[in-house]
């Protein structure tokens, strides 16, 4: 396997927070919060940082290194918060050694993107065909099964070059969770997680790395968060959902996926929205979370962090749709409010 390595985006999120309950001098002193993790929400987190910096006052240094790296740094307590599109496992939570909270930020769609001359957005993918492409069983662009779903497409007699993530990735977790639901062979042979043993393909680091490989290499096919495909002007496919409809990944179809699973979201918010019910639901979607400890070691940093998360899950939601992330449903925001009020430092709640 040839792996293209792309330097992780490191973004200094200049965010200023007015921290209540501390002295005026302390409130004016800069508070620095360090975080690391998912590339999936980077476009939105970047936007949030610009807007929030104009309103308030603490610097947040966020390393966009992938969900796997973010979880590792969070467990090691080398950052103030982690960020992931794949939930931590029970084993990882035990390793963290504290009360771990997954705070949903938004939901997003994982899309199938490709580079075939003359083939634009709208190529249809049935679940079994998509799984078999990543298993290496559907290896040609003009495979009869792919042609059957796309009778009008001019698909060449060329090898399909699969592109996947080379780093630990929540985007991979969402995608492989979906493949495990629709393909028994994938579930038993490969499985799901932030990292898996890929049967075939090239690797790219981060969503931006996969997008770069696909954009530069003819006959490739990979998976990225929707915003990365749009930003790079890359075509993406429609995926057949459980209702039998080929559905485009849009803000509306992603929201439909979330709505379909809203009643079953567990107390800890660890859930995927893959292969959901609903005629208009896009079948490959999930939350992106910020990971925090329920008991903060530093009252000032802890207050700054939960204040920002309150803003992000309220005022910050209005910036999500323009980047094609699905805002959190209001009923879910009400639950998150209750979760944030449980965050403490030195035994005292950090929010009213």
Regions found by a protein language model. Give the residues of each.
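Bacterial N-terminal signal peptides that target proteins for export
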Residues: 1-12
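Bacterial N-terminal signal peptides
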Residues: 11-21
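Flexible loop/hinge segments at secondary-structure junctions
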Residues: 24-352
């Amino acid at each position: 396997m040839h792996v293209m390595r792309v330097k992780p985006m490191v973004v200094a999120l200049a965010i200023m927070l007015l921290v209540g309950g501390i002295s005026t001098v302390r409130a004016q002193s800069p508070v620095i919060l360090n975080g690391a993790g998912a590339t999936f929400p980077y476009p939105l987190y970047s936007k949030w940082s610009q807007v929030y910096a104009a309103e308030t006052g603490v610097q947040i240094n966020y390393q966009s290194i992938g969900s796997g790296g973010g979880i590792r740094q969070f467990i090691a307590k080398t950052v103030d918060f982690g960020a992931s599109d794949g939930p931590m496992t029970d084993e990882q939570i035990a390793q963290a050694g504290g009360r771990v909270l997954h705070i949903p930020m938004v939901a997003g769609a994982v899309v199938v993107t490709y580079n075939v001359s003359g083939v634009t957005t709208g190529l249809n993918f049935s679940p079994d065909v998509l799984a078999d492409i990543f298993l290496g069983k559907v290896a040609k662009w003009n495979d009869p099964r792919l042609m059957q779903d796309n009778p009008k497409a001019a698909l060449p007699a060329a090898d399909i070059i699969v592109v996947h993530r080379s780093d630990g990735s929540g985007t991979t977790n969402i995608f492989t969770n979906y493949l495990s639901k629709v393909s028994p062979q994938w579930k038993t042979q490969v499985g799901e997680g932030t990292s898996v043993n890929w049967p075939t393909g090239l690797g790219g680091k981060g969503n931006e790395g996969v997008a770069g490989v696909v954009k530069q290499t003819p006959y490739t096919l990979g998976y990225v968060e929707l915003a990365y495909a749009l930003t790079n002007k890359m075509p993406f496919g429609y995926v057949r959902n459980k209702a039998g409809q080929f559905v485009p990944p849009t803000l509306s179809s992603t929201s439909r996926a979330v709505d379909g699973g809203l009643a079953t979201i567990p107390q800890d918010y660890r859930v995927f929205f893959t292969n959901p019910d609903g005629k208009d639901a896009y079948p490959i979607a999930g939350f992106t979370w910020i990971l925090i400890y329920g008991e903060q070691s530093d009252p000032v940093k802890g207050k700054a962090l939960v204040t920002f998360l309150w803003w992000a899950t309220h005022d910050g939601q209005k910036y999500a749709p323009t980047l094609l992330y699905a805002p959190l449903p209001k009923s879910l925001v009400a639950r998150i409010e209750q979760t944030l009020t449980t965050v403490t430092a030195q035994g005292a709640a950090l929010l009213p």
